[in-house]
Amino acid sequence: MKILAVSDVELGFIYSPTVAQRFGDVDMIVACGDLPYYYMEFIISMLDKPLYYVRGNHASKLEEGSGGPRRAPWGAVDLHHKAIADERGVLLAGLEGCVRYNQGGYQYTQAQYWSMAFSLVPGLMANRAIHGRYLDVLVTHASPWKIHDMDDRPHQGVKAFNWLIKVFQPALHLHGHIHVYRNNIETETQVGKTRVINAYGYRELYLDVPTRPDYLYEPKRKARRYIDEMKREKKI
């Protein structure tokens, strides 16, 4: 599966009538925050692929557009506080915003992030029972603690994200928030089984979507065999 990840800055070659020529082969778009709704809506309309997003700390509560005011991008799926399965079987979860540094919106304390991370656990456990794994793609705006983050308070990483990576081992953790102005800034780090990637601007990524392991089908197979035997014996 091919993913187009975008974050933080609008790019002319994406907000362009020719975007489908360059990115028409992607299967999914992931937006990691601080992008206007009209930008995400344009990508959806041009590529005709599902877009999943979280909000960044600079997101507007209400955005005016040609179709009138709206509180979310039309046609996109907000991942904040959710653990979901895509129609292709990709398991996604997300948390918005960044560490609180003033009274602005979409900012949370480290303690609040811990609470939100723990709230994802039931959904991730359900994923494990149904799909044989917890999570494929973790989507956040802020970065994990001491991974791609900075020392100033607005750009400090989130400690709870490190825990989510360690325990649930997603294949990808996509984030934004950290602007990349120099070539020597690290934007990709391997943490165990997880590739942590700063999607500032855009990134094209590939994800291998695992199939369900056979043992998850075994209870259904046993039940089906039992029903077939009962039918043969005319007991049902």
Each predicted region: which residue ranges?
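A short, gly/pro- and small-residue-rich
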Residues: 47-56, 158-161
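Short, conserved loop/helix-junction motifs that constitute active-site signature segments
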Residues: 23-24, 44-48, 71-73, 131, ...
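Active-site environment of divalent metal-dependent phosphoester hydrolases
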Residues: 10-14, 35-41, 57-64, 99-104, ...
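Binuclear metal-dependent phosphoesterase catalytic core
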Residues: 6, 83-88, 164-168, 181-236
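Conserved catalytic scaffold of divalent metal-dependent phosphoesterases
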Residues: 5, 9-14, 59-60, 66-156, ...
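Active-site neighborhood of phospho(di)ester-bond hydrolases with catalytic His/Asp-centered motifs
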Residues: 5-7, 28-34, 52-57, 79-80, ...
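Basic, amphipathic N-terminal segments that precede the first structured/catalytic domain
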Residues: 19, 42, 50, 55, ...
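N-terminal active-site segment of His-dependent metallophosphoesterases
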Residues: 1-46, 125-134, 231-235
